[in-house]
Regions:
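Conserved redox-cofactor binding core of oxidoreductases
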Residues: 1-32
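FAD-dependent oxidoreductase catalytic-site/capping-region signature
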Residues: 144-331
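Short, solvent-exposed loop/turn segments at the edges of secondary structure
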Residues: 30-32, 101, 107-111, 117-118, ...
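N-linked glycosylation sites
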Residues: 10-13, 82, 98, 142, ...
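Glycine-rich loop(s) and the adjacent beta-strand/alpha-helix scaffold that form part
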Residues: 25, 36-144
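Structural recognition of the beta-strand scaffold that forms the well-ordered cores
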Residues: 16, 34, 56-59, 70, ...
Length: 331
């Protein structure tokens, strides 16, 4: 908002419109000719056409970009058939681009909350609606105090080797407890599985044609084993003054793995870091052009594989490179 958008707003050939929902890409075979949009919540839609030689780029995200492609007649054949029955796909069936890779492999980081307690710790809970006056004064007058940073005060990573494979894991520390473990002296260790995980899902559409992701956590038991190893290694390094509250510090690898995969308020959580649902070489090519199309591109988290760290920066880097490659196509 402060960088890319501000630069774009200064361009004479840029138009910015809010309250707009793109339903589908209009196309003539493999050529995108425009988009159908709804504005300001209207039930009806209208079309916006592009000039000859123009392009359409979807940056709707790892859930809605696959939905947009499916509504445009690009995706798994059975899904397109169902969408067509409901009037969502308007492209004739002979022009459908059947590609099961659209929406496949969607990924989110499985998230685990481990509550740690020490009587040497003073927890700090952030309240942006009613912060302590002394902390407000510190921030407003001196740009100091706890509100100069987020509640997650540290982050760390490790790689777990499994034969020839390597699985990435991330840990962060939050300044207070979570769920029903909120006693002063409690902090939260968040554990995420990241790159190299094998358990992925698919972006499916409900009866209304709306994207509903399936994270499919721990469908491959090796993923639970990798994250359990990460947790076990952390427990071995904890000082004697720091005690896990919702799982025993002396738990075995097998016990940790079972706990991780058992649904609870502290395990199997989504962090909404959705990615990887329109992957390169199967859904888009190296220029992020949708396979089977001449001028339709996808630039967002759906083209990025699972990353070791928070995916935001990785998505930005991939997007900048994608723009360079797309611009080069027109030269």
């Amino acid at each position: 908002m402060k960088t890319y958008l501000q630069s774009a707003l200064n361009r004479t050939n840029f138009s910015f419109q809010t309250g707009t929902k793109v339903l589908r890409v209009r196309r003539d075979g493999g050529v995108a000719t425009g988009v159908d949009v709804q504005t300001n919540g209207a039930s009806s839609s209208h079309s916006i056409c592009i000039k000859k030689g123009g392009m359409v780029i979807s940056s709707a995200g790892a859930l809605l970009s696959p939905q947009l492609l499916m509504w445009s007649g690009i995706g798994e054949a059975e899904t397109l058939k169902n969408l067509s029955k409901n009037g969502h796909v308007t492209v004739p069936s002979q022009e459908w681009i059947n590609n099961t890779a659209v929406g496949n492999g969607v990924f989110d980081n499985p998230n685990t909350f481990i509550e740690l307690y020490s009587d040497e710790i003073a927890s700090y809970s952030y309240s942006y609606s009613n912060p302590p006056p002394s902390d407000v004064e510190l921030y407003l007058n001196n740009r100091s105090g706890p509100y100069t940073f987020a509640s997650q005060t540290s982050a760390f990573w490790d790689y777990i080797e499994q034969g020839d494979d390597v699985v990435g894991c991330q840990g962060t520390i939050d300044s207070a407890g979570a769920m029903d473990l909120l006693e002063n002296g409690t902090i939260t260790l968040n554990v995420y599985g990241t790159s190299g995980l094998r358990s992925v899902g698919r972006v499916n559409l409900d009866a209304r044609g709306i994207a509903l992701p399936n994270s499919n956590f721990y469908s491959d038991p090796r993923d639970a084993a990798a994250i359990a190893t990460f947790v076990h290694n952390i427990f071995q390094a904890l000082p004697h003054t720091l005690t896990p509250l919702n799982i025993a510090k002396n738990s075995t690898l097998e016990q940790i793995s079972t706990w991780l995969t058992t649904p609870s308020a502290y395990t199997r959580g989504n962090v909404q870091h959705w990615s990887s649902s329109c992957r390169m070489e199967s859904c888009v090519d190296a220029n992020t052009k949708v396979i089977g199309m001449q001028n339709l591109f996808v630039i967002d988290a759906s083209i990025v594989p699972p990353l070791t760290t928070n995916p935001v920066m990785g998505v930005m880097i991939a997007a900048e490179r994608a723009v360079e490659r797309i611009l080069a196509l027109g030269k």
